[in-house]
Amino acid sequence: MIKGIGIDITEIERVKKAATAHSQFIQHVLTPTELEQYSQFSGQRSVEYLAGRWSLKESFAKAYGTGIGANLGFHDIEIIDNQYGAPIVTKSPYNGNAHASVSHTATLVMTEVILESENK
């Protein structure tokens, strides 16, 4: 049974500017494991990865019903690419199944997260 759906669209350039302007931005958004994956990329691909994680976590927070804030932070959610590049939610406060999807254009990243209960 679907418990929540969240979508987000983020401008990649906006995330790039935030990362450039604020030295701790990347560490604020990414968990240590996500930072490991991030470090494997360079140039535009690293910016796309960061924008994708920002957007995925925003989508998760919307599906969860809280938004990012006092009750849910960026480090409460971890999303790692599997061997095929698909995003997998590996850490979250949600006890059911979490399904994530991400897509990029040259300027935008769009994400969706669906939270599903384990009981059907």
Swiss-Prot record:
UniProt cofactor(s): Mg(2+)
Name of the protein in question: Holo-[acyl-carrier-protein] synthase
One Gene Ontology term from the biological process aspect of the record: lysine biosynthetic process via aminoadipic acid
UniProt subcellular location: Cytoplasm
Organism of origin: Limosilactobacillus reuteri (strain DSM 20016) (Lactobacillus reuteri)
NCBIfam families noted in UniProt: acpS, pantethn_trn
Keywords per UniProt: Cytoplasm, Fatty acid biosynthesis, Fatty acid metabolism, Lipid biosynthesis, Lipid metabolism, Magnesium, Metal-binding, Transferase
Molecular function GO labels: holo-[acyl-carrier-protein] synthase activity; magnesium ion binding
Binding positions (Mg(2+)): 8, 58
Its job: Transfers the 4'-phosphopantetheine moiety from coenzyme A to a Ser of acyl-carrier-protein.
Superkingdom of the organism of origin: Bacteria
Enzyme kind, highest EC tier: transferase
The keyword Transferase belongs to this UniProt entry's keyword annotation: yes
Membrane-crossing residue ranges in chain numbering: none
Record-linked InterPro entries: 4-PPantetheinyl_Trfase_dom, 4-PPantetheinyl_Trfase_dom_sf, ACPS, P-Pant_transferase_sf, Ppantetheine-prot_Trfase_dom
